[in-house]
Amino acid sequence: FKTMDLSKNLQKFIMKIPRNGCVFICNPNNPTGVLIQKAEIVKIIAAAKKKSTIVFVDETFIELVPESDESVIKQIKNFENLFILRSLTKSFGLAGIRIGYGVGSPQIIGPLQKIKIPWNVSNIAQHAASAAICYHPFLDKTCKLIKKEKNFISSNLAKSKKFTCYNSTTNFLLVKTKTKSKLLQK
């Protein structure tokens, strides 16, 4: 996981952007929890635009990053090749409902509408999502609780010599175990 930091490989990444293709970026990354800086993603989007390539940015966990302004959702107005994916299931605890949304230019949304799955989100899911997004105190409270609990877990894992816990900006931790895999499989 030493090369997970895109800032160290940004130019190499940009050089590999395909012409007339698409690029998927998960920010924060899953499973590492590494948050890519907004400026770096904007450079990728701009480079992709020159190659007529669409950039999909999965921001499923971005709302669970405390005090962050690294979302590129406001860049939609500047780049017609950008599409943002968001989920309400993670940030608002609606995992059983499985609901999210996408934001992008008409040039991207139009073709996506033609190939979308034939069924829409249920009424129950729509009402639950509407209620959840209107209740901002829940998200603020959740972020504070996650930060506290994540610090507790990571500090206790760090005390053990059997685990390496990687820094994460979001609500999950990537943990490397020093225990042999055969023992873990038992």
Regions found by a protein language model. Give the residues of each.
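Hydrophobic residues at beta-strand termini and immediately following loops
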Residues: 1-4, 85
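Active-site phosphate-binding strand-loop segment of PLP-dependent enzymes
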Residues: 4-66
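Catalytic-core regions built around general acid/base machinery
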Residues: 40-51, 71-78, 111
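PLP-dependent aminotransferase class I/II
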Residues: 81-159, 163-166
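Conserved PLP-binding catalytic core of the aspartate aminotransferase-like
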Residues: 147, 157-186
